[in-house]
Amino acid sequence: EWIGTYSKEYIFTLIEFLYDNVSKPMLYECTDYRCTCHSRSFNKLEGQNEFRKDINVFLRKFEAGYRLGEEGYVLLIAPLELEVLVNTEVSTDKEKEVDERIKDATNKYLKFDSTISDKKDAVRTLGDVLEYLKQHNIILEGQDNKDLFNILNNFDLRHHNKIQHSEYDKEIWYEYFFYTFLSSINFLLKQNDHIVDDK
């Protein structure tokens, strides 16, 4: 009953704190004095993996479903039909320009306390990845590519001018933009022989 006195934000922040600081005891030293045992060494990675596995059993059942990611953020679980897309691990030879930006955008968009501004930043970051790929002539064919960059350039995501379309439901359309950009990036990388591993 007591857990109901705490907000979701408080509990999730506590989970993130515990994940950052948890370690698994590895080597014990026992003494005769009061029959006590003390750990002499710890493994942080193993501790985090076990903690994440255990806590995710409960987080998945809470509200719409959440998960604790490897980076230590409590994230909203993507819709079932898009979960594989979100969990696809991208590995390219342009880690800073592509891999890290995709990971940062995904974490920012799906984080339990993300705001509309956070979601806009996440969409814009994926747009930066598309722009980077475009500079290397990695683009969708024909009208599809034009449509992607029409969204980026004319829907108040990264430019500020009179032709921007800004009167739309941000919550709904940012979700559409995010998953459209993410799926387009993964498709382009697969088509161009970059390594994309499905977990």
Mark where each language-model region is:
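N-terminal leader/presequence regions that precede the main folded/catalytic core
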Residues: 1-15
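Helix-loop junctions and short alpha-helical segments
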Residues: 13-102
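A mid-sequence, solvent-exposed acidic-amphipathic segment
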Residues: 92-125
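Alpha-helical structural elements of signaling/regulatory helical domains
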Residues: 47-54, 114, 139, 161, ...
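HEAT-repeat alpha-solenoid elements in large eukaryotic scaffold proteins
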Residues: 126-130
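Alpha-helical oligomerization segments
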Residues: 124, 135-199
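Conserved aromatic-histidine-acidic binding/catalytic patches
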Residues: 3-6, 43, 47, 93, ...
